[in-house]
């Protein structure tokens, strides 16, 4: 008889805990569901670190022949701290080439430019003009994707870099974008820090050319202390 009384008690106890566990499972499921839809924190973009560039401009007989020679010379460039960064061809003269390499050290890059063998290699690759070298440090860079390989490089001298930069920022990237120019890069010459190089992606060619030659922009540049005629390089990125 006693065993018969104990059995219902055990059954009731089992049922109670079963119900309790079921409720906890629902609560856990709800909690898990809530946790699953919580958005993950956005990844922070790494802080920008300035870097140095070696700009080379020259004309070639045949681009493909020259490029093969350029690539074959890669190990020598690396020995002098130079690594390929960008390669462009002029819009009007596709055999006018703009080579931009990242560089570790200015002195080494200048030694590379003065190598007697370099002149021989360039001639063999079909370079038919005296190469022009420039060295700069990039202080701003935007490498976010853009749907164009068209670029314009603007080079000019300024009286005071900080005054110029303040005016550039006051003009604003939105204004430039509305005129077909997307900010990509600002660099300062390592030979003369008041020599400035600005690179834009060209999103609307007609608007960009109109803006760059406009009296409004000319006034902005004059007021900002630009004291040399700007040099413009319109080109297509190849790499």
Question: Model-predicted segments: where are they?
Answer:
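N-terminal secretory signal peptides that target proteins for export/translocation
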Residues: 1-2
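Short S/T/G/P-rich N-terminal loop/turn motif that feeds into the first structured element of a domain
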Residues: 20-239
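Sec-dependent N-terminal signal peptides
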Residues: 5-13
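C-terminal motif of bacterial Sec signal peptides marking the signal peptidase cleavage site
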Residues: 15-18
């Amino acid at each position: 008889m006693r065993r018969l009384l104990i059995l219902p008690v055990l059954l009731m106890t089992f049922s109670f805990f079963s119900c309790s566990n079921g409720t906890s499972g629902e609560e856990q499921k709800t909690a898990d569901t809530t946790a699953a839809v919580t958005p993950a924190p956005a990844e922070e973009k790494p802080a920008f670190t300035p870097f140095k560039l070696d700009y080379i401009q020259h004309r070639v007989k045949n681009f493909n022949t020259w490029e093969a020679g350029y690539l074959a010379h890669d190990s020598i460039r690396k020995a002098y701290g130079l690594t390929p960064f960008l390669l462009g061809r002029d819009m009007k003269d596709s055999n006018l080439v703009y080579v931009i390499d990242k560089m570790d050290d200015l002195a080494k890059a200048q030694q590379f430019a003065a190598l007697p063998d370099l002149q021989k290699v360039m001639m063999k690759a079909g370079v038919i003009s005296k190469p022009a070298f420039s060295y700069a440090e990039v202080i701003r860079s935007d490498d976010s994707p853009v749907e164009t390989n068209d670029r314009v490089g603007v080079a000019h001298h300024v009286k005071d870099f900080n005054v110029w930069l303040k005016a550039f920022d006051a003009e604003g990237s939105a204004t430039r974008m509305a005129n077909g120019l997307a900010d990509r890069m600002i660099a300062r010459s390592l030979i003369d820090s008041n020599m400035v190089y600005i690179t834009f992606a060209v999103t609307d060619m007609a608007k960009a050319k109109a803006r760059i030659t406009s009296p409004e922009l000319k006034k902005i540049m004059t007021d900002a202390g630009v004291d040399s005629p700007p040099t413009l390089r319109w080109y297509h990125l190849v790499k």
